[in-house]
Design a protein with these regions (language model features):
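Small/polar-rich, solvent-exposed N-terminal microdomains that initiate assembly or binding
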Residues: 1-76, 181-183
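Residue-level signal for secondary-structure boundary sites
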Residues: 63, 102, 163-167
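Short, charged, solvent-exposed linker or helix-capping segments at domain edges/interfaces
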Residues: 65-68, 166-174
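"Short basic amphipathic alpha-helical interaction patches in structured regions
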Residues: 69-71, 106-112, 126
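Short beta-strand/turn micro-motifs at beta-sheet edges
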Residues: 77-83, 144-145
Length: 183
């Protein structure tokens, strides 16, 4: 089963912008927040004194899909249109580089759970993404780059992502099936 990741990725980017107080289409957001490269060994390295945030969304290998069905049609209409919601567990991996790496990681960790209009949690919830409360504190590391050191903060947040699948219409019990009788 294949699900498009784009709407979820857009919602995560928007939530990061809300956490950091940046406009979604701002130049600062585009320079600061990046999706992780598929081949990290070939990824360009930002300057040591520049802040940058890389992130990726990985499905939890121990994730068993949980499905629920919802029937939005009122009773007695004769048709049932069933929407099935499948929930999968994901890990949101965030790696912050630069002098303010720890501050950014802590800010994302604390702000991601704020609710209300325009706040990160609502942005995620509207896209069917639900952060699991109480993530661990970010791990602070120092990477050697040549003869210099780069500050790094790693943060992992567990998410439940809900996908919507529209099932076909089915006849209700109220509408009698067509029966052909041959003699």
């Amino acid at each position: 089963m294949f699900f498009s990741k784009k709407p979820h990725h857009t919602a995560i980017f928007d939530a990061f912008c809300a956490c950091l107080g940046l406009g979604r289409g701002s130049r600062e957001a585009a320079a600061l927040i990046h999706e992780a490269y598929a081949e990290p060994e070939n990824a360009p390295r930002p300057p040591r004194n520049r802040n940058v945030i890389y992130w990726t969304l990985l499905q939890d290998p121990a994730s068993d899909p949980v499905s629920t069905a919802y029937n939005p049609e009122p009773a007695g209409t004769g048709r049932n249109s069933v929407t099935v919601y499948t929930t999968l567990k994901y890990q949101l991996i965030i790696v912050c580089y630069g002098p303010d790496a720890e501050e950014y990681a802590l800010r994302i960790r604390s702000m991601l759970y704020l609710d209300g209009s325009g706040f990160p949690r609502r942005i995620l919830r509207e896209a069917g993404i639900y952060p699991v409360p109480d993530p661990p504190q970010p791990a602070i590391l120092y990477e050697e780059e040549g003869s210099l050191w780069r500050k790094r903060a790693d943060l992992t947040i567990s998410l439940r992502v809900q996908y919507e699948i529209q099932a076909g219409e089915r006849n209700s019990i109220i509408s009698a099936p067509v029966v052909n009788i041959y003699r």
